[in-house]
Amino acid sequence: GGGGGWAAQAGGQVDMGVFATGESNNQAGSVNIATNGAIQTAGVNSTGILAQSVGGGGGFLGINTANDYRMLLGSSSSEGSNSSFDVSVDNKGAITTNGNNSAALIAQSIGGGGGSASINWKETDDQDGKASTPPLLLGGVDSKTANSGNITVTNQSSLITTGLASPALLIQTIAGGGGAIQSLDDAYAGIIEF
């Protein structure tokens, strides 16, 4: 509801969320997922299951770039309410991921907040040749109200990940807050706000 979405392989400025929406209200719906079969993925940023209820928030952002950029994942300058609802996942099949930044299962209820970001940047500083980091903003800014829902996850099978920064299970209910950032690079700290 008035939220972001999913982006990958992006360069330059990247903004996902709600900006200067005045008195608008951003309401997301409930999410219900039931799986019975096996799921297997390969490659970077290849999550097995991603279940999100996002109201005025972010989404999922996967970046693999050699360019500098700014990332804003969340809501900004909204006088209305940002509300997400319940997320339910019932998984009965084995999930296997074989790439970096590839969780087996992510469940998030986000109201005016952030989301999940996987970042792999290669921008270097001309002065010392070391990697530099872009400004990152993950979360809600100046939102009037932010409410997130409940999350229920029932897992009856194996969750296997083989890559770096690839949790088997990530569960978050976020109201006007942050989210999750994963980076594989030996980069120096930039501006990170939650």
Predicted segments, located by residue:
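Low-complexity, glycine- and small/polar-enriched segments
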Residues: 1-194
